[in-house]
């Protein structure tokens, strides 16, 4: 009964907060909020310039490699397992995939900034 009451209160409170979060911004429509911040000066040009696709690809590559490294973080705790061979094989496969991905990026010249 207590858990049901807590669940009901949590759902009600979160629903109320979501409704308020969607309702409040519509009350105060202020057109200057959409303009870019230019330190008090009028904008000289468009603030929405497209950025380099090369930068985007390098950033995505960094995120993918960072995620793969994050998968290796629990490795010291996994050493305490009884079957260490399976854990080491899994870590070796993960590092091999990481190395193959890095080699592929290197061959495809995905890590070079200049063209």
From Swiss-Prot:
Alphabetized, the UniProt keywords read: Electron transport, Membrane, Mitochondrion, Mitochondrion inner membrane, NAD, Respiratory chain, Translocase, Transmembrane, Transmembrane helix, Transport, Ubiquinone
Enumerate the subcellular locations listed in this protein's record, separating them with semicolons. Mitochondrion inner membrane
Q: How does it assemble?
A: Core subunit of respiratory chain NADH dehydrogenase (Complex I) which is composed of 45 different subunits. Interacts with TMEM186. Interacts with TMEM242.
UniProt superkingdom: Eukaryota
Function, in words: Core subunit of the mitochondrial membrane respiratory chain NADH dehydrogenase (Complex I) which catalyzes electron transfer from NADH through the respiratory chain, using ubiquinone as an electron acceptor. Essential for the catalytic activity of complex I.
- Name the major location: mitochondrion
Q: Identify one Pfam family in the record.
A: Oxidored_q4
Checking Gene3D superfamilies in the record gives: NADH:ubiquinone/plastoquinone oxidoreductase, chain 3
Stated family: Belongs to the complex I subunit 3 family.
Instruction: Give the Gene Ontology MF terms in alphabetical order.
Output: NADH dehydrogenase (ubiquinone) activity
> TM spans, by residue?
4-24, 55-75, 84-104
| Catalyzed reaction equations | a ubiquinone + NADH + 5 H(+)(in) = a ubiquinol + NAD(+) + 4 H(+)(out)
Membrane topology, as annotated, equals:
Multi-pass membrane protein
Q: Which GO terms describe its biological process?
A: mitochondrial electron transport, NADH to ubiquinone
The name under which this protein is listed is NADH-ubiquinone oxidoreductase chain 3
Question: Which top EC class applies here?
Answer: translocase
E.C. numbers? 7.1.1.2
Cellular component terms, GO, for this chain's entry? mitochondrial inner membrane; NADH dehydrogenase complex
**Flavoprotein among the record's keywords?**
no
């Amino acid at each position: 009964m207590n858990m049901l009451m807590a669940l009901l209160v949590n759902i009600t409170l979160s629903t109320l907060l979501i409704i308020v979060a969607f309702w409040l911004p519509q009350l105060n429509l202020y057109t200057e909020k959409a303009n870019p911040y230019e330190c008090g000066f009028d904008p000289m040009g468009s603030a929405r310039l497209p950025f380099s696709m090369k930068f985007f690809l390098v950033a995505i590559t960094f995120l993918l490699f960072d995620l793969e490294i994050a998968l290796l973080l629990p490795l010291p705790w996994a050493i305490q397992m009884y079957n260490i061979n399976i854990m080491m094989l899994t870590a070796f496969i993960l590092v091999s995939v990481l190395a193959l991905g890095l080699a592929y990026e290197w061959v495809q010249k995905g890590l070079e900034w200049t063209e």
